C-alpha cells in the first residue's frame, strides 16, 4: 500500500496528505477479505507520513482495537500523546487538511502530470474550477492555516519542533501551494494579482527552511524536507502567462446529496471519507434511496460520484440506478491501470458516471435508487441536473 508515490499520473512525495480515512477503509476491506498474513507499506520519506504509518501499523497489529474506536479517535489519541489538551483544537484542523487534500492533493494543483508524452502536461495550467470553487477552496485553506498559526503561538517551546513538523508545516505548506497555483489561475484571467502567487512560492521556501533548521532540536532533521521533490514543474514559481479565455462556469445541480444524506436504505457510513466526509459503503444487493421533486422535466441527468477502487471479485465494479421502481440501468465503473479514466480517478478521488433517466410523471416526488451489484461500492455524492447540462459537465470532467 502506498502513502507516498512516485509515478503517473503524478507523484505525491512531498507532504503526508494521504487520507487516513481512505487508508482505514481500504485496509479494513483487505482485512475482511482475509488478507491478514502480511501487509507492506510504501512510505517514501518517513517524516511526512508519521501518522499514516502509525495507523497502518496499529491496524496490522490489532485491527479490532482500532475498529473499536474508529480512525478519528485513534488520530485523537496520537495527537493527545504529542500535544496534550491542545489536541482537541488540532484534530478538526488536521481532518480538514486531509479532506482538502483528498479532493485534490497539493502536488496536483498545477494540472501537470508525470510520465506523459504530451509536453502540455509539463506546463502549469488551469484546473477545471470555477471562480467560486477557487475562492471557496482558498477560504478553507486560509481558515485552517490561520488557526494553526494561532495555536503555534501558545505552544510550549519544547513542543515547537514536533508541532511544526506534524501540524504547522503540512497545513501551511499545503495551503501556500494552493494559494500559489490558484492565485496564478485567477491572475491568468485578470481575477487576482501575480504577486500573491509569487508570495506563496516564497512562503513555501521559508517554511521549509524553518522545518530543516528546527527550533530547539539542533537541526536534527536538517535536509530531510525538500519542497521540490524531483524538481517537478508544479513546484516552480508560476510563469506569468495571461489567458484570453474566461474562467469556466458550470451548471448548478437541482439536487445534491452526500451518500449518508440518502432518504432511506441500507449502508455503512465510512468515517471521514469523501469530499464532505460523508461517503457510504453499500453491500451487494443493498440499495440507498434519494427522494426529489421535479416540476416540468420528463427526464433527469443523474451524476454518481463514487470512490474509485479496483474490483474485489472478478473484473467488474457494478451498481444499478433506477427511478420510482422502474427499469434498473446497470453502471460499471471498473477501470484499468494507466488508462485515462484511471488517471482522472486518481487525481480527483472520484469515479464519475452520468446517466439520463426518464420520469413517468412530473410535478411530484420521485425516488432515485442506487443499488450495489458487486462488492466494493462506495457512494460519495449524488447529483441531479437537467438533461441539457450534460455537455457543460463533460467540459468539467468526462464521465
Task: List each language-model region with its residue ranges.
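Substrate-binding groove of N-acetylhexosamine-processing glycoside hydrolases
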Residues: 1-259, 365-366
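Extracytoplasmic
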Residues: 221-399
Amino acid at each position: 500500500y502506498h502513502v507516498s508515490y512516485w509515478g503517473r499520473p503524478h507523484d505525491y512525495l512531498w507532504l503526508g496528505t494521504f487520507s487516513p480515512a481512505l487508508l482505514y477503509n481500504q485496509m479494513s476491506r483487505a482485512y475482511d477479505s482475509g488478507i491478514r498474513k502480511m501487509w507492506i507499506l510504501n512510505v517514501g520519506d518517513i517524516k511526512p507520513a508519521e501518522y499514516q504509518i502509525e495507523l497502518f501499523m496499529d491496524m496490522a497489529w490489532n485491527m479490532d482495537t482500532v475498529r473499536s474506536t474508529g480512525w478519528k479517535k485513534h488520530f485523537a489519541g496520537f495527537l493527545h500523546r504529542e500535544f496534550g489538551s491542545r489536541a482537541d483544537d488540532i484534530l478538526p484542523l488536521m481532518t480538514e487538511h486531509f479532506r482538502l487534500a483528498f479532493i485534490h492533493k497539493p502536488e496536483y494543483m498545477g494540472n501537470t502530470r508525470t510520465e506523459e508524452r504530451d509536453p502540455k502536461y509539463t506546463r502549469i495550467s488551469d484546473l477545471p474550477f470555477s471562480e467560486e470553487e477557487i475562492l471557496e477552496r482558498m477560504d478553507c485553506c486560509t481558515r485552517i492555516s490561520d488557526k494553526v498559526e494561532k495555536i503555534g503561538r501558545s505552544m510550549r517551546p519544547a513542543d515547537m519542533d514536533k508541532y511544526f513538523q506534524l501540524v504547522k508545516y503540512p497545513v501551511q505548506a499545503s495551503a501556500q501551494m494552493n494559494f500559489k497555483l490558484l492565485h496564478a489561475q485567477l491572475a491568468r484571467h485578470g481575477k487576482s494579482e501575480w504577486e500573491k502567487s509569487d508570495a506563496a512560492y516564497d512562503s513555501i521556501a521559508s517554511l521549509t527552511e524553518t522545518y530543516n533548521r528546527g527550533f530547539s532540536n539542533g537541526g536534527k532533521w536538517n535536509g530531510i524536507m525538500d519542497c521540490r521533490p524531483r524538481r517537478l514543474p508544479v513546484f516552480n514559481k508560476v510563469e506569468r502567462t495571461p489567458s484570453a479565455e474566461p474562467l469556466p462556469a458550470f451548471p448548478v445541480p437541482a439536487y445534491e446529496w452526500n451518500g449518508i444524506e440518502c432518504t432511506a436504505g441500507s449502508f455503512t457510513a465510512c468515517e471521514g471519507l469523501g469530499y464532505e466526509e460523508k461517503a457510504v459503503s453499500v453491500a451487494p444487493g443493498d440499495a440507498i434511496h434519494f427522494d426529489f421533486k421535479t416540476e416540468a422535466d420528463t427526464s433527469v441527468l443523474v451524476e454518481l460520484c463514487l470512490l474509485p477502487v479496483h474490483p474485489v471479485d472478478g473484473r467488474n465494479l457494478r451498481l444499478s440506478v433506477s427511478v420510482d421502481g422502474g427499469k434498473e440501468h446497470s453502471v460499471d465503473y471498473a477501470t484499468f491501470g494507466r488508462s485515462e479514466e484511471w488517471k482522472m480517478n486518481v487525481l480527483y478521488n472520484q469515479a464519475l458516471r452520468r446517466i439520463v433517466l426518464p420520469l413517468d410523471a412530473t410535478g411530484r416526488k420521485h425516488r432515485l435508487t442506487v443499488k450495489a451489484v458487486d462488492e466494493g461500492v462506495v457512494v460519495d455524492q449524488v447529483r441531479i441536473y437537467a438533461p441539457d447540462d450534460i455537455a457543460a459537465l463533460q467540459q468539467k470532467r468526462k464521465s
